[in-house]
């Protein structure tokens, strides 16, 4: 836990890691609280009809222990990969805690995955078991024959299918279970990378990953836990963002976590959840925050009680930061990390560590720098790759079954991120773009984030992405893919207005010379734009046609 020091520089100097010899995530987020406050509410589930449900730490600990015993009785052993293909809710949280308690490895997967994406991850991980619902089961059936290592299917709802075990039969069993004694480096969790730049890789984490998240988490939520704190995120718990930026750290600190049914993001529903469930702390990725802007005068329509608001996953940008400050009455604490090494940079609005358009400063306990291709630390103001120095408790153990990729991730003791950035004289880091996303035009290196932020501020634009399109004269030109707000007509007049908007706010070399109006943008399950697909589309357009 962070010492409650209200000065960032002093906090940075005085912070020390205290990693115990043994640590188990499942015990820390359930049994530890159940022993001292069993009636304390740990999970709440929002229902649109008002029939909200709640679960106490006592019940959470008992059910997850029973579930762990049930998995063990069905042949699941320590070290086995156990997939969780469930929506946010009590069952998913119980499954996570149970898997950690028994020393197995949790493999969270998104219900948005198609048949091939699901099969790829299950096969690559060699998953021994999967816990899913009827929707996930139907996806699984199509590829079951390709998964010889998958021995157990636990079904969380619906009738009993041949070869499956009902979730309730395991969770309602005998609750006495001797949790595995695990060390911080023992494998606990495997999350597949987003696949924004290539085939997804399984990032394997030890139990220490939760401890590694705590300083940055407390920093951007201003010394959480405070009285009345309650957490919600629209992010899927199958993503590092939803799981490690919201669910697990909150449960560790005794802060109730609110879940809601998986659905297409709806701004009004998001505000309703925050109002009805008395949400005080939220993690809302930048794309979702931009979609919230469609609701005019939100504080007049909804009684919000937000104390802290964190955002990460993509660059937030000045426009969205200023909107939240003006319309929500709160400064967003932007932070940064990736699946392999999360929350290593963070803003702390409560400590005055905030600069619109910046991701923040290095979080206590983490060494972060901008380096060149040889691993040399670059001076302030120089653009290079964001890198994190090992050892670090939040850093992954390695890529599953891919030692070559793990080695390639490091230059000496610096873990490279593949993200271009810059650090200023005050120590603030600004995201420039993925290595592959940086646009080279007329000799300029242009980060797409600033252009997208500017586009998002246009009154007619709902979402936008900028990529480089090959050009024989300029190397590349900026091409923007734009989703317009409802009711706005697509056409050259609208495109010209958007071009002028960017030209007047940024610079002549950064405005999009081409604009394509689209109904939607390709997204990962974690809400990141897959610019690679848009680049491929732009490159195909640039190639001369034959015949």
Residue spans of the language-model regions?
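Structural core segment of the AMP-binding/adenylate-forming
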Residues: 73-74, 97, 101-169, 182, ...
């Amino acid at each position: 836990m962070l010492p409650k020091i209200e000065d960032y520089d002093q906090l940075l100097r005085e912070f020390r890691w205290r990693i115990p010899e043994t640590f188990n995530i499942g015990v820390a987020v359930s049994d530890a609280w159940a022993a001292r406050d069993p009636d304390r509410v740990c999970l709440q589930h929002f229902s649109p009809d008002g029939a909200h449900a709640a679960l106490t730490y006592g019940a959470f600990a008992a059910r997850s222990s029973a579930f762990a015993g049930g998995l063990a009785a069905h042949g699941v052993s320590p070290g086995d990969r156990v997939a969780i293909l469930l929506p946010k809710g009590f069952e998913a949280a119980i499954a996570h805690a149970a898997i950690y308690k028994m020393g197995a490895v949790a493999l969270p997967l998104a219900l948005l995955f198609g048949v091939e994406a699901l099969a790829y991850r299950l096969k690559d991980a060699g998953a021994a078991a999967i816990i899913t619902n009827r929707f996930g089961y139907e996806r699984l059936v199509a590829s079951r024959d390709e998964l010889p290592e998958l021995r157990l299917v636990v079904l969380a709802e619906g009738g009993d299918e041949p070869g499956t075990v009902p979730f309730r039969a395991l969770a309602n069993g005998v609750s006495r279970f001797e949790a595995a004694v695990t060390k911080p480096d023992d494998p606990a969790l495997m999350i597949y990378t987003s696949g924004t730049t290539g085939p997804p890789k399984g990032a394997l984490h030890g139990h220490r990953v939760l401890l590694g998240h705590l300083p940055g988490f407390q920093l951007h939520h201003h010394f959480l836990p405070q009285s009345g704190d309650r957490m919600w995120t629209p992010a899927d718990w199958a993503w590092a963002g939803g799981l490690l930026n919201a669910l697990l750290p909150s449960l560790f600190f005794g802060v109730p976590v609110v879940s809601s049914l998986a659905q297409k993001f709806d701004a009004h529903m998001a505000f309703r959840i925050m109002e009805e469930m008395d949400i005080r702390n939220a993690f809302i990725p930048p794309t979702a925050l931009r979609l919230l802007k469609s609701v005019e005068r939100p504080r007049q329509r909804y009684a919000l009680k937000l104390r802290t608001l964190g955002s990460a996953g993509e660059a937030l940008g000045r426009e969205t930061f200023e909107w939240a400050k003006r319309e929500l009455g709160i400064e967003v604490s932007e932070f940064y990390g990736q699946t392999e090494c999360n929350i290593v940079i963070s803003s702390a609005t409560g400590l005055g560590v905030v600069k619109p358009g910046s991701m923040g400063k290095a979080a206590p306990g983490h060494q972060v720098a901008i380096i060149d291709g040889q691993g040399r630390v670059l001076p302030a103001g120089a653009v290079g790759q964001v890198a994190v120095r090992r050892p670090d408790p939040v850093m992954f153990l390695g890529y599953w079954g891919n030692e070559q990729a793990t080695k390639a991730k490091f230059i000496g003791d610096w873990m490279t991120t593949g993200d271009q950035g810059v650090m200023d004289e005050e120590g603030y880091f600004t995201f420039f773009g993925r290595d592959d996303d940086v646009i080279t035009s007329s000799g300029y290196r242009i980060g797409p984030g600033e252009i997208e932020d500017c586009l998002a501020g246009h009154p007619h634009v709902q979402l936008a992405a900028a990529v480089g399109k090959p050009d024989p004269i300029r190397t590349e030109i900026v091409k923007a893919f734009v989703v317009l707000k409802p009711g706005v007509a697509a056409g050259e007049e609208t495109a010209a207005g958007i071009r002028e908007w960017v030209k007047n706010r940024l610079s002549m070399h950064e405005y999009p010379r081409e604009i394509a109006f689209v109904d939607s943008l390709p997204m990962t399950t974690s809400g990141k734009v897959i610019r690679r697909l848009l680049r491929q589309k732009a490159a195909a357009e640039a190639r001369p046609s034959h015949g």
